[in-house]
Amino acid sequence: MTFSPQRPEFETGKQPDPETEHAGDFFEETSSSAPRAASNGSSGPNYTLITTFLAALTAGIFAFWAGWTRKWISDDGLIVLRTVRNLLAGNGPVFNAGERVEANTSTLWQYCIYLVALVTDYRLEDIALWLALLFTTAASIIGVLGTAHLHRKRIAVLLPAGVIGYFSLSPARDFATSGLEWGLSLMWISIQWLLLVLWATSGKTSGKKASGAKTSNPIVNAGAITYALAFWSGLSWLVRPELAMYGGLTGVLLLLTAPRWRVVLGILVAALPLPAAYQIFRMGYYGLMVPHTAVAKSASDAVWGTGWEYVEDFTGPYNLWLGLALLLAAGALTVWKTDKHLAIPKGRLGLRTPGMAIALLVICALVHFLYVIRVGGDFMHGRMLLLPLFAILLPVSVIPVNVVDRGWQDLVALVLVFSTWVWSTVVFVQGHQWENTGQHVVDERDFWIDFTNRDEDHPPLYAEDFLTVDSMNDYAEVMRDQTLVNPTGQQLNILASSDPTTYSWITTPRVEGVEAGDLANLSPTVFHVNLGMTSMNAPLNVRVTDLIGLATPLAARQPRIEGGRIGHDKLMDLEWQVAESATPLAYTPGWLDTQKTYEARQALRHPELVHLFQTYREPMSYHRFVDNIKYALTTGRTLEISDNPEDLLKEFNPTPAEIQDGLETIAWPGEIKLDEPRGEPLYSSQ
């Protein structure tokens, strides 16, 4: 994407409007020793345009190939697809039909899959894989075009650098697919970067001559790009919550540089309605201000030490600091070649410059890095650091090397780029050597290949590929022959044999009579630590819950385990889960504490828990919607319950657990719609 730098002057005698005047910036004006492509009288090839196209093509091909060779789907990716199944069936954007729980972090990602599923018969796993891969590919191309636009006035060869370094990293290739929203997030960041660059180069600049103003990029309408950037910034919150920082700071910059109140109003109108409308919907429908995953993975505590260990786990295997040093040094040389005599931007209106666009993106990325470190990182190798890394590498996604009037900086930049390519090649070939030793941070792709008892060349791609996990032994058979045939309270995972280690599944009957009460409205329930593989291998009329709290509010509200695995540091006891199901107390599994199970069932009627159940189970109505908004703004932000039911029983007058009739309702009857089986796989991993 290149634009001819036409420079129409104002009419004679007219001075530029001080409210729209901006000073030039170092990427707008190149040094006198580096002639502008547009002002060169040569009829030779446009090296900048040609190499922009080649760099974008190279980046796209490399990103696609890198992601394709590591294609797979994670258990967390399957969680998203369960919500999509409920959307397709007509049960709403929920994980379990009848329970309004937002189990996915990215709002837009689930709807992207849903929209494609509406018009195709492809399996959801295939749709998720292809969308993620195409979004990732688009992100690499758009990122290159955005950076190349900064150098459009040079006569230079643009060499792909940062984008090559990024996709040489094993986790970057792993999360190019995986079923998660990383491809969508990368594309959002890239488009945000491109729009920032176009915005920064489309205002009016004051040149060295005082006679008039000139338009730095007349092909892009300055007003339209401002509102487009505002709208795109508003979407940040719906892509991933932490991207709201990028969108929010961009919005602040747009407001600061707005020349008139009418523009300020236009920016607000473009940016706020969609995210604000969804936020009202989220609070009224789910009873929360944030996705439910944010409640389960509470980030309220600062664990800097653990976070830095997470950084070292990511940087160490790839000598990432070396790669970053090479890329940032090449970027610094690009800045070094700028004309030191350019006017310094003055006033708030002078902030509309490419330099400010770069500074904004870098600041956002650095703050993002700090946030990840503060919350302790993640349990997946490199995952949470990929987005800020991609963002900070965008300004150096390509490095310009001047074709004419080359200086020593060009030679050094060329050496640095080639060194980056060598480093990237070594890192790409070497990969990430990981062994499952039970550590807190795991290579998620290799973990699931190992956990599903598959080999490296056949990673899991579909829900049924996870049935080879040891703990999923006979899961589908018990589901088909018992859970869906007989009145069932729960389907439970058991250790059938310790030598050799063998797992199996059993079922419990359903409550009846006075012990049932409204618990009889609960569907047959599967309880397991991994939500994706259990839920995607079960029909929608089977309720699937977890002990971490991703889809289980009762678990999400329990206290964190000190020193636990980041992101998985809440583990609800099985006694709570049996109590909060349609399982008769007499059939409490023998390995559980029967007294604790009894007390947990009593504690379900604690006023705070009753209110919690109402927010996501009571049928939707105007009253429920309004009450949920109030709850989201108050109790929903802070509620934490003890994992010991005895503590809760001290706070109210409990009734005997054997009698559930006539109590405050915590489960409501409702119709559950089933989805239709989808088409054959596009390819086979077998």
From Swiss-Prot:
Family membership: Belongs to the AftB family.
InterPro entries on file: AftB-like
Keyword Transmembrane helix applies: yes
Organism field: Corynebacterium glutamicum (strain ATCC 13032 / DSM 20300 / JCM 1318 / BCRC 11384 / CCUG 27702 / LMG 3730 / NBRC 12168 / NCIMB 10025 / NRRL B-2784 / 534)
Gene encoding the protein: aftB
Protein name: Terminal beta-(1->2)-arabinofuranosyltransferase
Record's compositionally biased regions (Basic and acidic residues): 8-25
Recorded phenotype for the gene knockout or disruption: Cells lacking this gene show an absence of the cell wall-bound corynomycolic acids and of beta-(1->2) Araf linkage.
GO biological process: capsule polysaccharide biosynthetic process; cell wall organization
Keywords carried by this UniProt record: Cell wall biogenesis/degradation, Glycosyltransferase, Membrane, Transferase, Transmembrane, Transmembrane helix
Entry's EC annotation: 2.4.2.-
GO molecular function, one term: glycosyltransferase activity
CC annotations in GO: membrane
Region (Disordered): 1-42
Chief location of this protein within or outside the cell: membrane
Function statement: Involved in the biosynthesis of the arabinogalactan (AG) region of the mycolylarabinogalactan-peptidoglycan (mAGP) complex, an essential component of the cell wall. Catalyzes the transfer of arabinofuranosyl (Araf) residues from the sugar donor decaprenyl-phospho-arabinose (DPA) to the arabinan domain to form terminal beta-(1->2)-linked Araf residues, which marks the end point for AG arabinan biosynthesis before decoration with mycolic acids.
Pathway noted in the entry: Cell wall biogenesis; cell wall polysaccharide biosynthesis
Entry's localization field: Membrane
